[in-house]
Amino acid sequence: MPRRGPVTPREIPPDPVYNSVLVQKLINKVMLDGKKSIAEKIVYGAMEIIREKTKQDPLVVLEKAVQNVTPLLEVRPRRVGGATYQVPIEVPPRRGLSLALRWIVRAARERKGMPMKERLALEILDALNNTGGAIKKRDEMHRMAEANKAFAHYRW
């Protein structure tokens, strides 16, 4: 904990098109080297692709996809005696949202052979249908937590 007192989370203004903090956070995660206008084009392009493919409001689709990817448990290392145990703990909502967006963007970047807006749109649609790289990452994290359930009493 810092000596200057508790850290207050920064207030993120909603994006101008969808008036959503979630979309603004996604834009910030997509952004590389401070190039926000490029990140905005990618995200808004992906949202248009989602609108065309699903015939639904892309904001609702994005919220559901992020909800599907958000992990409930994660493991944290804890040293006890001479051994380091992987202790499963619940993920706080802010961290869960951050992890979900990070995994969606990473999975989209790992897809190859098409523009980033298409890759992002496909990854969001996959997350909506509980498939894709981001869901695989969440399941892997849940499996690790399940495997280390015996160490849950070391929680702090």
From Swiss-Prot:
Tell me one GO biological process term.
Answer: translation
The portions of this protein that span the membrane are none
Q: Name one Pfam family in it.
A: Ribosomal_S7
Keywords, comma-separated and alphabetical: Ribonucleoprotein, Ribosomal protein, RNA-binding, rRNA-binding, tRNA-binding
- Name the GO cellular-component terms: small ribosomal subunit
Superkingdom per UniProt: Bacteria
Q: What Gene Ontology terms describe what this protein does at the molecular function level?
A: rRNA binding; structural constituent of ribosome; tRNA binding
Subunit structure, interactors included: Part of the 30S ribosomal subunit. Contacts proteins S9 and S11.
What's this protein's family per the entry? Answer: Belongs to the universal ribosomal protein uS7 family.
- For this entry, the protein name equals Small ribosomal subunit protein uS7
Species per Swiss-Prot/TrEMBL record: Dictyoglomus thermophilum (strain ATCC 35947 / DSM 3960 / H-6-12)
